C-alpha cells in the first residue's frame, strides 16, 4: 500500500469516528511510525509501506479512536517552539498555557527594568514545559 493510500485510510477511519484534525493526525502518526518528518511523507506519497509499518500505523489509529491522545503515542508535544517528552504520567502542555508563559515573561521584563530580583519556582508540574520555557 502506498503512503498516500495509508494516510487516506487513516483519515477516513478517524473521520468516521468523529475525530477532528484527522488528516493532521494520520500524517503525524505515519511520520512517527516511519521515523520520518511530515515533509518526507509529502515528497514520498507514492512509496510503498511495509506490512509491519502498516500494522503499527493501524494499531496507533485504533488507539486514537479509543481515546488515547496523539501526544501520548508519539511522546511529544510542542510548546513555545520547544519539543517536550510527554507520557501518561504528565499532563499534555496546552496552547492556552502559552499565554500564561507569555504574560509571565512580560511581567518579568518589567521587573527587570526596575532591577528587581526575580525568582520562579515550578515544582512537580509534569513535563517542565512552563519552567523551561520561562
Model-inferred region functions:
Residues 1-42, 49:
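Non-catalytic accessory regions of SAM-dependent methyltransferases
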Residues 32-107:
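Conserved AdoMet
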Residues 7, 26-27, 57, 67-70, ...:
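A general structural signal for well-ordered alpha-helical segments in protein cores
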Residues 1-2, 37, 55, 109, ...:
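Generic cytosolic/nucleocytoplasmic N-terminal low-complexity/intrinsically disordered segments
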Residues 99-134:
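Conserved SAM/SAH cofactor-binding pocket of Class I
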Amino acid at each position: 500500500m502506498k503512503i498516500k493510500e495509508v494516510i487516506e485510510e487513516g483519515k477516513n477511519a478517524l473521520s468516521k469516528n468523529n475525530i477532528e484534525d484527522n488528516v493532521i493526525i494520520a500524517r503525524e502518526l505515519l511520520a512517527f511510525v516511519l521515523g520520518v518528518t511530515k515533509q518526507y511523507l509529502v515528497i514520498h506519497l507514492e512509496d510503498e509501506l511495509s506490512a509491519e509499518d502498516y500494522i503499527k500505523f493501524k494499531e496507533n489509529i485504533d488507539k486514537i479512536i479509543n481515546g488515547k491522545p496523539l501526544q501520548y503515542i508519539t511522546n511529544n508535544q510542542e510548546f513555545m517552539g520547544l519539543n517536550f517528552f510527554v507520557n501518561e504520567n504528565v499532563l499534555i502542555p496546552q496552547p492556552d498555557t502559552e499565554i500564561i508563559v507569555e504574560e509571565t515573561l512580560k511581567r518579568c521584563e518589567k521587573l527587570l527594568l526596575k532591577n528587581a530580583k526575580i525568582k520562579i519556582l515550578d515544582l512537580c508540574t509534569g513535563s517542565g514545559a512552563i519552567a523551561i520555557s520561562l
